């Protein structure tokens, strides 16, 4: 029975190791095919057809019914009598200005913990069990030691983090959805490949049409539920990231 359980444990470990190897191998083959050319840029596609796209649903105010007035040139809800060149419909473009300058964060934490515990009853007998145990144990039994125990633990930890970021870019985004209250759901993606390193900048969120400036631009801090991602892949990223084995070890190792 024990041998069967050991075989099952070994089989499970082998399956996990094989799965990790297959996943790493798939990415390895892809990276090997990019040697000399750098990471391949993705094609231009419809953002709403991406697997991670989710329509936005937010609380909305009560709708207002516009009453037509034939004798007026102005319609309730209109922003301007003349043609507005700013984004206003699904599929329109606008420029998002991302200017994250001198974003810094410093964090340090030191922890030292020591704990000791000791209990003893100093009993001369332990319900008569000391005689029975003396027949089994060659050195005899001290009743006081049966009711005394102690423990000691010590833990020391140090952690620190220093971060400095500067991102200054302009990114064209597309209006994907118009919410019932008139706000726009936008998304934009930009890829730049330089010397074998592919840098990606993505922006998604909800904006107000009133915040769009006359030159059809909007600042990143005016985007609600903003999701701004700046990263990449390539030779530089490979140098700064730990190897796959080290990442798996850090996740699975419990101590």
UniProtKB/Swiss-Prot annotation:
One term of GO molecular function: cytoskeletal motor activity
Lipidation (S-diacylglycerol cysteine): 26
Keywords associated with the record: Bacterial flagellum, Cell outer membrane, Lipoprotein, Membrane, Palmitate, Signal
Cross-referenced Pfam families: FlgH (PF02107)
Subcellular location: Cell outer membrane; Bacterial flagellum basal body
Signal peptide boundaries: 1-25
Membrane topology classification: Lipid-anchor
Sites of N-palmitoyl cysteine lipidation: 26
InterPro entries: Flag_Lring
Membrane-spanning intervals of the chain: none
GO biological process: bacterial-type flagellum-dependent cell motility
Family indicated by similarity: Belongs to the FlgH family.
NCBIfam families: PRK00249.1-5
Function: Assembles around the rod to form the L-ring and probably protects the motor/basal body from shearing forces during rotation.
Subunit structure: The basal body constitutes a major portion of the flagellar organelle and consists of four rings (L,P,S, and M) mounted on a central rod.
Protein name, entry field: Flagellar L-ring protein
Gene: flgH
